[in-house]
């Protein structure tokens, strides 16, 4: 993955898509990652124009293009998709090179090495770290083409199920939701699954990092004999409503409306309708089941099971560690996050929360824990309704109320909803539910992909959208616990 791709990374938060301030926070983490791994760039002034490439840890690649202009040089970083980030302050006297990315408080200084035909220098961010760049071929500069074999197979068809566009109302939320209902071949009635996506402006397919997670998941469920309803989140795609004003409780209200609508369909067995949620959806699924006793089952994929503020602190530290940030920064940021979230939780109003956040962020900037770009948006983001609600929400009491079959899955490499802490909380909350299954899937990340580190920058580069092993565990569990009568899949 290129430097620009990393800089443009927007943290999943705990789920699928990401508030603006997560992007700014992760930019700082990414810079630390690049520094720790020796990332930089340089070029001989006489031949500076053209393409250059560097590699970090054998996998992360940075591509740079320089052009000569009347005032000197201009340059960009190019990510695998071809998106560019402008470099600042590019200067070279023939043997030395300097450039900066001002908005990240990052700079590079290098010296030309005749022996290696490369720039050897240091990336500066709080301290200095080594880096080397060499000339790049056209092939090396080409945008990476990521294969999606599971999605390609689905699109190639034919499929043993039918799909149709649907709309349903959430009268409590005063909005209408648009989605896709997919039904296995046959007469039915079929057990039904409502898919609930994670945080962010997600469509019905949960399009994240170049993957269509719910497309692949729905296909697997349909082939096992389940009807599936997936929908665009409020304010996204074909759904109405105000996304930005919503909290997790509002998204849960939408999921409740989806369950109620699905039960009314003639080909659905209303007694066997359940909810499957990913990430934030993994909080919503048990909340819907606790509020509606007729929900037949719950599946939680990477669903948080500890209070929001504790999760965010843990997530921040583990994500930074996965990116290779220095231990000192991780420790300092943990203290800062704890103090910030405590202040937000104790604030009596959104305005008070904003004021307290501004004070703490100013201290964070002075202590070089928060950079200037993050400081612009962080106070507003952490004081908004969604964040304040989530910070205070503890999923465990809701889980403890469930008596229906529950499957809770986390990947061992998940850095956004870490398996150890969250599954321990799930086991404790569900200990009286004999129908609950809690599993940690070895070597899998937040999307249940087979991964190396679990860091979010791997998601796009991994070809599989969801591990076939994980899909089999989910569908086998549902077959055992739900699919006891009625239609059997034709293929």
Label every PLM stretch briefly.
Residues 402, 408-410:
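Short beta-strand/loop motif that positions the catalytic acidic residue
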Residues 142-188:
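N-terminal cap/lid segment of alpha/beta-hydrolase-fold proteins
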Residues 299-401:
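Accessory cap/linker subdomain of secreted extracellular hydrolases
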Residues 46-114, 118-127, 160, 166:
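Central antiparallel beta-sheet cores of small beta-barrel/beta-sandwich binding domains
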Residues 245-266:
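Alpha/beta-hydrolase active-site loop
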Residues 216-238:
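Conserved alpha/beta-hydrolase
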Residues 188-190, 199-223, 308, 415-416:
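Short substrate-entry loop that stabilizes the transition state in hydrolases
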């Amino acid at each position: 993955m290129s430097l620009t791709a990393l800089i443009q990374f927007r943290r999943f938060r705990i789920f699928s898509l990401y508030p603006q301030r997560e992007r700014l926070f992760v930019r700082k983490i990414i810079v630390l990652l690049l520094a720790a791994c020796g990332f930089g760039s340089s070029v001989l002034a006489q031949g500076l124009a053209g393409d250059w490439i560097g590699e970090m840890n054998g996998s992360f690649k940075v591509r740079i293009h320089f052009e000569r202009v009347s005032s000197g040089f201009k340059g960009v970083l190019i990510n695998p998709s071809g998106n560019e980030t402008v470099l600042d302050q590019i200067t070279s006297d023939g043997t030395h090179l300097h450039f900066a990315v001002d908005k990240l408080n990052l700079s590079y200084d290098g010296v030309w090495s005749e022996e290696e035909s490369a720039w050897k220098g240091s990336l500066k961010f709080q301290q200095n770290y080594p880096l080397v760049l060499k000339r790049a071929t056209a092939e090396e500069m080409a945008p990476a083409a990521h294969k999606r074999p599971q999605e390609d197979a689905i699109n190639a068809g034919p499929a043993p199920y039918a799909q149709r566009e649907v709309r349903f109302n959430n009268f409590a939320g005063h909005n209408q939701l648009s989605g896709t209902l997919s039904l296995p071949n046959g007469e039915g009635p079929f057990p039904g699954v409502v898919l609930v996506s994670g945080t962010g402006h997600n469509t019905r397919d949960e399009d994240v990092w170049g993957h269509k997670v719910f497309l692949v998941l729905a296909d697997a469920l349909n082939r096992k004999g389940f009807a599936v309803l997936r929908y665009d989140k409020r304010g996204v795609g074909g759904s109405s409503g105000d996304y930005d004003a919503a909290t997790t409780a509002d998204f849960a209200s939408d999921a409740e409306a989806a369950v109620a609508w699905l039960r009314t369909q003639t080909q659905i067995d209303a007694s066997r309708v359940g909810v499957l949620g990913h990430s934030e959806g993994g909080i919503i699924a048990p909340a819907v089941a606790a509020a509606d006793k007729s929900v037949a089952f719950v599946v939680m994929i990477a669903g948080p099971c500890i209070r929001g503020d504790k999760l965010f602190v843990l997530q921040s530290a583990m994500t930074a560690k996965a990116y290779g940030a220095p231990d000192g920064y991780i420790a300092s940021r943990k203290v800062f996050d704890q103090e910030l979230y405590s202040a937000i939780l104790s604030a009596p109003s959104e305005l008070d929360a904003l004021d307290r956040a501004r004070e703490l962020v100013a201290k964070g900037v002075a202590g070089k824990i928060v950079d200037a770009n993050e400081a612009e948006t962080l106070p507003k983001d952490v004081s908004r309704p969604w964040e304040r609600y989530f910070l205070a929400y503890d999923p465990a009491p809701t889980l403890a109320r469930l008596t229906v079959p529950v499957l809770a899955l986390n990947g061992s490499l998940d850095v956004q909803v870490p398996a150890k802490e969250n599954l321990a909380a799930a086991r404790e909350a569900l200990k009286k539910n004999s129908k609950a299954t809690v599993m940690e899937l070895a070597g899998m990340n937040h999307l249940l992909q087979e991964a190396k580190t679990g860091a979010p920058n791997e998601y796009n580069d991994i070809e599989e959208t969801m591990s076939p092993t994980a899909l089999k565990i989910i569908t086998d569990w549902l077959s055992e616990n739900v699919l006891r009568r009625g239609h059997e899949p034709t293929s």
